[in-house]
Amino acid sequence: MSFPYQHTSRSQVQPPLAAPGLSMFAPVSSSNSANSASSVAALLSHAPMYGLGQRRPSFLPGVSVPDTLSVRSGFSIPSSSHHPSAVPSLLSQHRLQQPQPRLYPSAPLNYYWPSYQSVPSAAPPPPSQQRYMPDSAVAYNPNQDQFGNSVNVSAACNNVSAPLIANNCAPSFYQSRHPVADVPVTNNTATTTSETDNTIPGNLNMPSVANVQQRISPVCKTNMEDQEETVYTGGVAAKLDYKMDQMVEYLSIMTCKLYARFLNNAQMHSLANSLPGLVFSFRKVVTQILTSTRLPRASCLLALSYLSDRLDAASQTTDFVNQWTKESLFFQICALLTTALILANKFLDDNTFTNQSWSQVTGFRTALLNSFEQDWLASMSWNLSPGPRGQKAWEWWSASYSLFTSSNATYSGEQKTYSPTTLSTNAPPSPSSGRSCSNCNYYYPYTPVGYYPVYNRYAMT
């Protein structure tokens, strides 16, 4: 389509209400609108010719098209911009360009996985405003602080209840269990034995202090800090030995990084580069699993150890690579982490959950979980015992998690100050005392040569 071009020296009349500084983009009052260059520009201005961020076409020689056009009106071309050397044949050479879809630039790899090299400058939002919340109701109400329910104690201190789901008065699993220890009932009198003094603090007059149903919530407002810390090695932890948001973040990042290393070893770099975009969605799945199962830290770290060994051995197997790459990437990481948590929980405490329970939590069919577990056990020769090598792996994963929590400290209640180079006192000492944390290999445990593959070659930072 071509437009005849005729130069005219007709003076253009600007409307009196034109915005100051934008008079050149105001509508034109012209009688000869069919042959004037202003009518051509006004015609072209009604349809978007180019998208945001693309090079704008030069439809008319000597005419500059502005970047942004007024929504309420078109634009005109002043008489000074009419070039006398314009040739009508030049207009037919310019095709109407179709608007191209905007290609969003890929985010840098360190956008989703920030480097936790220093203490955050500002405190994060309270737990009630955290962004990693499950959409559906879970076993423990996530709307409470630290993903737990507060314990309801009556005025007589003899009715302790902590419902698993809001507005549910039915007796729960924990309310039907026997007390952990036989604590003698006292009537607000001073205790006489040293054993009772160590069990019940003097300022806590509750007869069932060691009962599971009282210690069911991690945000109990009573003086639970005075009790002796209980170390959980498996099963459902009544009092978690980690912060929920930190463990969710750590499991999400480490699972994606371990699987990215597996894909890079299998020469699937394009799939590995797409993993950072799945971290945000994967956090919701991990939150759903941890809040429903209440697994202790030992089960989570052992699952990562199983997952690392499994992927390292399977990266050299063609059948495993072909089988897992048929599914979507999100399905792969969810299935692998779920299977690793199942095996870790069954190794530490085989009396807690069945595969049917895991199916209700994760959404996978029970037959599919059975198939995942059978294939995993066959690759491990049906031996879940860590052994000497597994003990060393446990030490490395514990040190890695301590580094992660100390450098990514959160604020719950009181503000706490952490040093990015100081490990937690409860964690085992790091065996790599002479090593320093590199920027590209911060989350992985540092191991001697020959134990784990060198992580900095596959780390995605």
Curated annotation (Swiss-Prot):
Database matches in CDD domains: CYCLIN_ScPCL1-like
GO biological process: meiotic cell cycle; negative regulation of sister chromatid cohesion; positive regulation of macroautophagy; signaling
GO CC aspect terms: cyclin-dependent protein kinase holoenzyme complex; nucleus
Pfam families listed in its UniProt record: Cyclin (PF08613)
Stretch list, region Disordered: 75-98
Domain of life according to the entry: Eukaryota
PANTHER family, per database record: PHO85 CYCLIN CLG1, PTHR15615
Protein's job: Has a role in meiosis.
Protein name (database record): Meiotically up-regulated gene 80 protein
Gene coding for it: mug80
